[in-house]
Amino acid sequence: MSALFCDATHELDAIGLRCPEPVMMVRKKVRLMAQGETLLVSADDPSTTRDIPSFCRFMDHTLVASETEQAPYRYLIRKGQ
């Protein structure tokens, strides 16, 4: 796992969940975070490889890093405004 992922402020385990649950959980968790904090998401649903980057763009958050070559997938999100 990349060193970037080790410094996450918050973590969310979405392994075993299927669309749309992972993105719904990310949205709920990010709402409780302060601007600039980071969230490490672990998921194994292939749809997250499309849905989480789209969520970040739509909600003006930054997808700092991702590992999507094989499950479990990992995403590091920095909360925007």
UniProtKB/Swiss-Prot annotation:
SUPFAM superfamilies reported in the protein's UniProt record: SirA-like
Localization: Cytoplasm
Cellular component terms (Gene Ontology): cytoplasm
GO molecular function: sulfur carrier activity
Coiled coil spans: none
GO biological process: tRNA wobble position uridine thiolation
Active site residues of this protein: 19
PROSITE patterns given in the database record: UPF0033
A Pfam short name: TusA
InterPro entries in the record: Sulphur_carrier_TusA (IPR022931), TusA-like (IPR001455), TusA-like_sf (IPR036868)
Chief location: cytoplasm
Keywords assigned: Cytoplasm
Family indicated by similarity: Belongs to the sulfur carrier protein TusA family.
NCBIfam families from the UniProt entry: PRK00299.1 (NF001423)
Function description: Sulfur carrier protein which probably makes part of a sulfur-relay system.
HAMAP family, per database record: Thiourid_synth_A
Protein known as: Sulfur carrier protein TusA
Organism: Aeromonas salmonicida (strain A449)
